[in-house]
Amino acid sequence: MSWTSLVGTALSTMLARRTRLMGDAAHWRRHTAGLQRRQLRLLLQQAAQTEFGRSHDFARLTRLNDADLLAGYRSAVACGEYDGFRPFINRMRDGGEIDVLWPGRIRHFAQTSGTTAGDKYIPVSREMLRSNYRCALDIFANAQRFGCSLHRLLTGKVLFLGGSTAMEVNKHGIATGDLSGIVTPLIRWPISEIYLPGKRIALMSDWPAKIEAMARACVHADVRMINGMPSWMLVLFERVLELARAGGRPAKTIADIWPNLELIVHGGVKYAPFDSRVRTFWSGRSDGPDVARRLELYPASEGFIAIQDQPGSPGLRLCSDAMNFYEFIPLERVNDAAPPAFAADEVEPGQRYVVCMSTCAGLWRYIIGDVVEFDAVPDRLGRPDTGSGPARLRIVGRHRHFINAFGENLIVEHIENAVAAAAGATGLLLGEFTAGPVYPQEATDLAPSRRAGLEVVLEHTGDISPDRLARFNAVFDSELKRQNVDYTTKRTAGLGMAPPTVTVLPLGSFHRWMQQRGKLGGQHKCPRCANHRDFVDGVKAAAGVG
């Protein structure tokens, strides 16, 4: 028995009470509203003497009762995006100024992937690191609830597919880089003994070289848990299998190499489109057995947002007691001058909202851009038994990532669900994908006329027969119609939009395109759709397809 299993046993004991609490749905239904008001009050109290806190009278707000606190806060602080915080952040990061948005000096800034805009620098305070640590413990607490033995899990290795841990440090001692670079150095003994790929490989910023080094470091290891985006797990799985076979091992699947792999923790992108390929790598069949357990997260550079608390459920429970306060802006109102925002107990199931956060690192009513829907909502403040469960939400897109060139009103979730359904119906093993509009054009001497439409570009492991591709296209189109009445209308009776176009590229095309953009790595996501053709044309050009 490995001595690190004792760490798992100790962690299991330490988390026993929290594990029970994670499973108490009635507790989270009853108390989420109060917990969230408490987080807001604590945030305002801590930041009351900062420049931002003084100018927005946080000290006065902290003296209000729970019923008036939120209304007062909303009156004092407007919802805003990064540009509104940029001057403050520049002073804190470049000038080393203290007590600006949050008490003291912020010594770490997470550089975001910039999926909807240019790079942003998100403050990461000591309190935020503690918040993230607490949420990380909740991952293990929920894993126990899902049937994982921490004793058994921590007997082997835990593999993290994160970004580079290399940081740029300025003259004020302030470090900027991937969030991985801020968190990984905090891994201490004894967890450091089971952590893969190790700090030397974690420092690497050349992602193809990093995947190669990671595969070589873990091909002979007893990997029992993997944390990362599924798209990069697949790249690693493929290389690990190649190395194992080259070394003479009769490995047909990842299960042959890592038979004790028990838990995949994933987040950042929707898992369903990658499910069949993960199963194929694990068991040899796209409809075969899966890794024993999967657990989905909703992490962000701004703070941890939600964790899956029910096996197999798409709804993720809001981290309502982690020193962050969440509000939700109706998607159709997000561009208003003063958009309305609702606390977790004020939302309605099935409506789309843009996430707005107030964090323990000094972002106040900050619009992060993700679009979510709630499957369950908690009791309203002071109104028992009015909710349907803990605050559980699903990520359905980005408020700047949509397709509405012809009134079709498609969002990321529609595209992801349609790709997953079509892949499942045809048995295709897909990689990355994206979609964009096809603009109509009149016939010319050089080209025929073209109707308005939609193009989806996707990766596949090999050749696809015309019949199979036509079947994929038909299911993809049908699934979009099922989800979206506007798309159905535009596709009915020749009212404007032609059937979708599917362009198939070889595996690796998207990562080559991302590398050309300087966006390759475990912290960067391929955009799933856009209301322009930049992504579609860019990845096709990178693959040499006109």
Residue ranges and their predicted role:
Residues 143-190, 201-204:
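Conserved AMP-binding loop of ANL adenylate-forming enzymes
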Residues 135-143, 304, 312:
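Short, basic alpha-helical nucleic acid-contact segments in DNA-binding proteins
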Residues 110-116:
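Conserved helicase ATPase motor motifs in RecA-like P-loop NTPase domains
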